[in-house]
């Protein structure tokens, strides 16, 4: 599979999560399941490479070739 064609967005966040999206080329996108969110082993098997802790959290129906990921931000110590 062509890992060079996978595009990784910059990371962005809110108060709770860090987010990123990953755009897959058409040949890989056709392998994305339409019935469920992928486990880490499933998206890694497609060639997506990112650190541990990312969760495929949403399917964007109009653009199924874009995978939406998030992971919890580290808890800030209370002052």
From Swiss-Prot:
UniProt superkingdom: Eukaryota
Keywords: Acetylation, Cell cycle, Cell division
Keyword Transcription regulation attached: no
Iron in keyword set: no
GO CC terms of this entry: cyclin-dependent protein kinase holoenzyme complex; nucleoplasm; SCF ubiquitin ligase complex
GO biological process, one term: regulation of mitotic cell cycle
PROSITE patterns: CKS_1, CKS_2
InterPro entries linked to this entry: Cyclin-dep_kinase_reg-sub, Cyclin-dep_kinase_reg-sub_sf
GO MF assignments: cyclin-dependent protein serine/threonine kinase activator activity; histone binding; protein kinase binding; ubiquitin binding
UniProt modified residues of type N-acetylserine: 2
Similarity comment: family membership: Belongs to the CKS family.
Task performed by this protein: Binds to the catalytic subunit of the cyclin dependent kinases and is essential for their biological function.
Subunit-structure text: Forms a homohexamer that can probably bind six kinase subunits.
Protein name per its UniProtKB record: Cyclin-dependent kinases regulatory subunit 1
Originating organism: Homo sapiens
Name of the coding gene: CKS1B
